[in-house]
Regions:
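Active-site mouth loops of central-metabolism enzymes
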Residues: 47-59, 114-125, 193
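Active-site beta-loop-alpha junctions enriched in small/polar residues
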Residues: 52, 56, 80-82, 108-115, ...
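Short coil/turn connectors at secondary-structure junctions
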Residues: 1, 38-44, 70-73, 100-105, ...
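Residue-level marker for buried hydrophobic side chains located in beta-strands
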Residues: 45-47, 107, 241, 441-444
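Active-site microenvironment of metallo-dependent hydrolases
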Residues: 1-24, 32, 68-70, 252-268, ...
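Histidine/acidic residue-rich metal-binding segments in metalloenzymes
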Residues: 124-144, 150-215, 222-241, 252-266, ...
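Divalent-metal coordination cores built from histidine and acidic residues
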Residues: 64-171, 472-474
Length: 544
């Protein structure tokens, strides 16, 4: 029997009890109060209610090493990034790798692969695939349902996916940015139980009124805590915390779910409500096998120095200490010798500079970037002189943006984007939600072609090209992940970001923001297979 002492935070009874926890075979057998004084606190481990581990560019094992040190004990992972590239093979890779992680990783089945009929991904996940996957017992629900028109119009394939999950009485996550009114009612009635895309309080309250749970998101690209934080006091039982997408640099320096907990406590919200949102609410909603510091449950908890900064001293998972502040985690890469050539799909040939030409007349439509958001604006600009090839207009902060299918040799789609700040060079990425084709932004065609071709020749990664000088992070797993450890990746990532900032880019997370510029299921203007796509009308401008 193991005994752990400290100030035990009882969220259910809203009490802090000095005492000890008895653990046997990974289960809490008793909790005793002893009246002693302790300088540390025992709390339930944090739960991320919606995350795409692939967005960290790390495997589940390496991801777990970064978040456990922040008190995270479990995450609900939607593997739709790797599924868009490799389908069921990619999903199985994530599940198998997660078995060796330090935390509990639960999986939902990707619902929309590809995201829409307008996307071109490497693979499909059909209703038949979902039926096969759900029978495996490896999944706790259906991932974010992005095909809103499919639900509203009762598309047979979409509705069959939903019915398969409802048959098992499992939760279905939502993805409904700006959805309101009658369309929202139909969406909820289909069985959608959560949404993590709310950007305004009014939107969140309407969804709560219809029975949805709201996931307050604070990731590397989308940050909605400030807009939604009053829900912590008004609806503490209807909200959860999530990160959605975070890069390793932020996980190391800013934290994970703990950063929202610290912020909420600092903002004066009730400690027990905040901890409930970060721990108990996702456990109950998703039916997770995660302990919450009660007798008879698994011994899953964190020991923190205080209830202000929440510095993590140690973390226990099923009674075993998986992290200790004084013992460095093993960051050795155990998988470098693995042949992961079958874990990628890259059929694209390099492009020529001449393929990037685009003529413009006086007025152009631009994607308007908002730093800290993944939504964009539809903006109009006037160009003084018509051009047979407008590479950029730096005075107006207008750059060329290129979308290139990596699964087949189609012509590049070219448009313009405003709000990046870059004044020289170009950068590109094969992380491009959700189909993970190549997307690039640049000031001139020569550097654009260089950045794009660097990714093609290496079959995935992040690249910067400045007058021919290349900086690069290789991502050999599906063109979106690496087997390298989080510290190594964070160092390269930080170097790339510093370089982009030195080149004039003022976005806080340039690659993360760029990766969402092809996600056409997020408002308002994005770029895809046929050029610019307008979300509110759900069509390509070229189709008008």
């Amino acid at each position: 029997m193991k005994k752990i002492e400290g100030n035990i935070v009882d969220i259910y009874r809203k009490k802090i009890i000095p005492g000890f926890i008895s653990i046997e075979n990974g289960i809490i057998t008793s909790i005793f109060q002893n009246g002693k004084k302790y300088d540390h606190y025992i709390i339930p481990g944090f739960v991320d209610s919606h995350v795409h581990i692939e967005s960290s560019m790390l495997t589940p094992v390496e991801f777990s090493k970064l978040v456990i040190r922040r008190g995270t004990i479990a995450v609900i992972n939607d593997p739709h990034e790797i599924a868009n590239v490799l389908g069921k093979k990619g999903i199985r890779f994530m599940i198998e790798n997660a078995k060796d992680s330090l935390i509990k990783i639960f999986f939902t089945i990707p619902s929309c692969v590809p995201s829409t009929i307008y996307d071109f991904s490497g693979e499909f996940v059909t209703s038949d695939d979902i039926g096969e996957l759900i029978e495996s017992g490896d999944f706790i629900g259906l991932s974010e349902m992005m095909n809103i028109p499919g639900i509203i119009c009762n598309d047979p394939e979409v509705m069959q996916k939903i019915e398969m999950i409802r048959k098992y009485n499992l939760p279905i996550d939502g993805h409904a940015p700006s959805l309101r009114g009658e369309d929202l009612r139909k969406y909820v009635e289909a069985g959608i139980s959560t949404d993590h895309e709310c950007t305004t309080l009014e939107e969140a309250l309407e969804k709560i009124s219809l029975g949805m749970k709201i996931l307050i998101r604070e990731g590397s690209a989308a940050k909605n805590y400030e807009s939604l934080k009053s829900l912590i006091i008004s609806h503490p039982d209807q909200v959860m915390f999530c990160t959605d997408d975070s890069h390793p640099g932020d996980l190391l320096s800013l934290g994970h779910i703990d950063k929202m907990v610290k912020r909420a406590v600092a903002d004066g919200f009730d400690l027990f409500d905040v901890l409930k949102i970060a721990t108990i609410n996702p456990v109950l909603h998703y039916g997770l096998k995660v302990g919450t510091l009660r007798k008879g449950e698994t011994a899953d908890f964190a020991i923190v120095k205080d209830l202000v900064d929440f510095e993590v001293l140690s973390v226990f998972v099923e009674g075993k200490e998986r992290y200790n502040l004084n013992s460095e985690l093993n960051s050795d890469n155990q998988m470098l010798s693995i042949d992961y050539s079958d874990l990628n799909k890259f059929e694209r040939e390099p492009i020529l500079v001449s393929e990037l030409k685009k003529s413009v007349e006086k007025d152009i439509i631009c994607i308007g970037v908002i730093d800290g958001e993944i939504v964009t604006k539809k903006e109009y600009f006037s160009i003084q002189n018509p051009s047979i090839n407008l590479e950029s207009d730096l005075e107006q902060d207008i750059l060329k943006i290129v979308y290139l299918n990596r699964y087949r040799n189609t012509k590049p789609q070219i448009a313009y984007i405003h709000g990046i700040g870059l004044n020289k060079g170009a950068f590109a990425t094969s992380i491009s939600h959700d189909s993970h084709n190549i997307i690039a932004v640049g000031c001139n065609d020569q550097d654009l072609a260089c950045a794009i071709n660097t990714i093609i020749l290496n079959k995935g990664g992040l690249s910067i090209c400045d007058s021919g000088e290349i900086s690069f992070l290789s991502l050999p797993i599906g063109g979106i992940m690496t087997f390298s450890n989080g510290i190594e990746v964070a160092q390269i990532w930080d170097h790339l970001i510093e370089k982009l900032h030195a080149m004039g880019c003022y976005l806080s997370s340039p690659f993360m923001t760029l990766s969402f510029m092809a996600l056409i299921v997020i408002p308002e203007l994005k770029i895809g297979e046929k050029g610019l796509f307008e979300y509110s009308k759900f069509h390509f401008l070229s189709d008008i």
